[in-house]
Design a protein with these regions (language model features):
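Glycine/proline-enriched, intrinsically flexible loops and inter-domain linkers
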Residues: 1-88, 93-580
Length: 580
């Protein structure tokens, strides 16, 4: 279908912005109507529009690993039902990690075909974290899972709504397979309603400009996306760039898992090859293929054109190679519920490979892990389940000319947030005893890494269960250009008897009233030789409590003396000259 006249570039841009706005309205509608704090506070969801072939044409800010998989999920719908098998008002659901829209079972994909003139012309798709969908542990995702069947119910692509009517059979199955069915069904209906918001917006756009003009504009701006990517790609240095890293272990305490990449940059292609990456793991850190492909997309965009509008055309120069039966491309029934513990490395190792080639676009390593947590149990006062799910923020790596950021969510989490103290204490039987910057020694450099966080949750219930998965607990964030490595992530249980347990993972650990779970996220890697950091900046760090006087002398070569503290310039010059 084509327009009857040439479309001017202004109309193309207006229609593109209108479609992006429709995706953003979908995102906001879901956040405002969901029942779970992991959606309305954390914003653990993503939304996008595709064309009738499943090509991504517009997205809202959200979790990067969600956006890239939604086109795959739409293509699964088309592959199963065909366009002729869809009716106006249908909404389809899938959460199967081994299908195209995969992450883990908690992340449900809902898809609505948008009809205009009696035909499906686009799709609205969203993915959101549902707090509990069954499985062996409350909250469903589990660091101790050994197969996918322990991680909750799985839906292949099925119709959740038939021509606008709820499929009661599917709804009943959902209600019987979760510990908090009213929360799950509330989130499901909010998600469905948000798709309808996007559909109405798209239909208004088609009414205003005409379907032919809208579809032709999409083709034009997809071509523009490819042209923009190629133009930026040609500014990058050609070559093959390699790196490798190690994931802490196989998810169950075994050996470290190798992650290897070779990035090939040419004038017309950006190839990410993960050949040499370690095998499928026993534990649940395996990443389904489509989420690794999505992570490769945002790593590619961050290097090629960070501020471009992402769409199928923009990503067309990217080619990703992922061998089968690896941690990045596992086989059913391998567990995947803490997939982020490997998937995050799919982006991180690309940045590490390119750090010297494009130093203005890459920072040192950051704390990397989602550092996901669940605090749950039967509320003593209400007699019902409570399940709090959230990520944790941490320290980012420094870049050339810029210190790292303090307390931001990891790269894979994108536009998400942690729970506020007020929401945590109001919604759940939790008291927040401490919420502070982690000033552990590490991440020093000419530009130091950003600080992680320390957060203490004291249990205000007779009993609670705590689950936590804090990857990068053995191998800290890497420094660049002479900067020092950062510090690892860690979780600790402090019991009322004075005992302390420190681990990278807890799985449904029983806590009693008064026990404290402490979440510690790492400091990012530093950039550049610490001995050339501006002495005044070092003094400021000392005054702020980020660097000790001893570390200022030993690491930065800055002598700080007196009360109030000041720089001894003569001794500083002597210290620094002895190093160089």
């Amino acid at each position: 279908m084509t327009a009857k006249h040439a479309i001017d570039p202004f109309t193309v841009e207006v229609i593109k912005r209108a479609l992006i706005s429709a995706a953003e309205q979908m995102f906001v509608a879901l956040g405002r109507t969901a029942k779970s704090s992991v959606i309305y506070e954390v914003l653990d969801h993503g939304c996008a529009l595709t064309d009738a072939a499943g090509r991504m044409i517009a997205q809202a800010n959200g979790i990067p690993a969600f956006i890239g998989v939604l086109g795959d999920a739409v293509r699964d719908v088309i592959g199963k039902f065909g366009l002729d098998g869809l009716d106006d008002g249908d909404i389809l659901i899938t959460n199967d990690p081994y299908m195209g829209g995969a992450t883990h079972q908690n992340d449900a994909v809902l898809i609505l075909p948008i009809f205009y003139g009696g035909e499906p012309v686009m799709f609205a798709a969203s993915k959101a974290h549902w707090n509990d969908i069954g499985g062996k542990d409350p909250g469903s995702w589990s660091p101790s899972a050994t197969d996918i069947y322990q991680e909750g119910i799985q839906f292949p692509v099925v119709k959740l709504f038939n021509a606008g009517e709820e499929n009661r059979d599917i709804v009943d199955i959902l209600a019987r397979n979760g510990r908090i069915p009213e929360m799950t069904l509330g989130d499901m209906r909010a998600q469905a309603a948000s798709l309808r918001v996007a559909a109405r917006r798209v239909q208004k756009i088609c009414n205003k400009y005409g379907l032919d003009t809208v579809l032709e504009s999409i083709e034009v701006y997809l071509r523009q996306g490819r042209q923009e990517a190629l133009a930026e790609l040609r500014k990058l240095p050609e070559g093959v760039y390699e790196a490798e890293e190690y994931i802490d272990d196989d998810g169950l305490g075994g050996d470290p898992v190798r992650v290897k990449v070779a990035v090939t940059i040419s004038d017309d292609e950006f190839v990410i090859d993960y050949t040499g990456t370690g095998p499928t793991c026993r534990g649940p850190i395996n990443s389904p293929l489509s989420v690794v492909m999505s992570t490769a997309k945002f790593a590619y965009q961050s290097i090629v054109a960070p501020h471009a509008d992402p769409n199928e055309g923009f990503f067309s120069p990217l080619r990703v190679i992922v061998p089968e039966d690896t941690v990045f491309n596992p086989k059913r029934p391998a567990p995947v519920s803490t997939y982020w513990e490997s998937d995050a490395y799919a982006g991180d190792v690309v940045w590490r490979a390119l750090a010297e080639a494009v130093p203005d676009r890459v920072t040192a390593g950051h704390f990397l892990s989602v550092c996901g947590t669940i605090v749950c149990g039967i509320d003593d006062a209400a007699g019902e389940w409570f399940i709090s799910v959230e990520p944790n923020a941490g320290g980012w790596g420094a870049g050339r000319g810029k210190p790292g950021e303090n307390g931001l969510v990891c790269s894979a989490d994108g536009e998400t947030y942690i729970l506020s103290v007020e929401v945590a204490e109001t919604r759940y039987p939790i008291l927040v005893d401490q919420f502070a910057l982690n000033v552990a020694d590490g991440g020093h450099g000419r530009w130091p890494g950003g600080h992680g966080l320390i957060k203490d949750y004291r249990i205000a219930n007779s009993q609670a269960l705590v689950t936590a998965s804090f990857g990068r607990n053995r191998y800290p964030p890497w420094g660049l250009a002479g900067g020092q490595d950062g510090t690892p992530n860690q979780a600790e249980v402090h019991r009322t008897d004075g005992s302390v347990e420190r681990r990278g993972r807890f799985s449904s650990e029983i806590l009693r009233e008064g026990d404290v779970i402490r979440f510690i996220t790492g400091t990012g890697g530093g950039y550049g030789d610490p001995n050339v950091r501006d002495p005044q900046a070092v003094l400021d760090d000392v005054l702020d409590g980020f660097v000790s006087i001893d570390a200022a002398r030993a690491i930065y070569g800055v002598a700080i003396v007196g009360t109030p503290p000041r720089i001894d310039e003569e001794e500083t010059a002597s210290l620094r000259s002895s190093v160089h």
